[in-house]
Amino acid sequence: AESSTSGSDTASADGFATTDDVSDAPDITGITIESQMVLNYAECFNVYYCTDGYKLIDVKDGAQYLLVPDGKEAPDDLDSDVIVIHQPLERIYMAATSPMALFDAIDSLDTIRLSGETADNWYVQDAVDAMNAGTMIFAGKYSEPDYELLVSENCDLAIESTMILHSPKVQEMIEMLDIPVFIDRSSYESQPLGRTEWIKLYGAMLDKEEEAADFFANQASIVENLKDFQNTEKTVAFFYINTSGAAVCLLYTSPSPRD
């Protein structure tokens, strides 16, 4: 991949910004990288903007994904290990749970046709409403998807959590059906706003970068306003009840207690 390294930034009025300093960009045969998305907290992904409207998502310790614009094809000489995702995305299988709220925040639940959870398991009310209305349907949990339904519904992308790494045969089967698999690694971010900033990645997938940047800026502002919040020095026990009915207490280093 050819690249520019002058280092200037460009930003729209709503906060979406790119830089043409791509000196650290991966070298991918078949594409020319021109700029990359500016990130403030996230450390586990980068989004690169290429010639002719292509975008490259590079997930740390994960995979690389090429977003191919509507009406175009992947370059013939593209590196074989780059996963190709064709836009527009309209019939996603959402097997991961955390991205649902991010899709909802940029008004994009209509791109999700298939769900890895039943309506009563969703914490996002708009997702519950979509399932009750039939515009989003249950397609099996991440570990046991309904492959026939994925095919009959013309699924164009499966979004999975890292739990799919424990079910490699499931991922392989989905890919054998010519459905690209994107693995969300937002849980590996070291701080809450890093995980929230993954909304910018999904904004790039859906060509909604401005909407995603607006939402993130608002959330960052809320957190910034808490910087002077007085520490009471009080502690709290954080636990949940698992499917066996047992109380599970998380370590203080785990994401929820830290957040």
Question: Where are the regions that the model predicts?
Answer:
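Active-site catalytic microenvironments for nucleophilic, acid-base chemistry
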Residues: A105, M205, S256
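Extracytoplasmic substrate-binding proteins
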Residues: T135, E148, S152-A247
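Bacterial Sec-exported substrate-binding components of ABC uptake systems
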Residues: E2-M100, E211-A237
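A short, structured surface patch at a secondary-structure boundary
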Residues: G53-V59, Q64-V151, L157-I164
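Glycine- and acidic-residue-enriched helix-capping/strand-helix junction motifs
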Residues: L114-S115, A246-L251
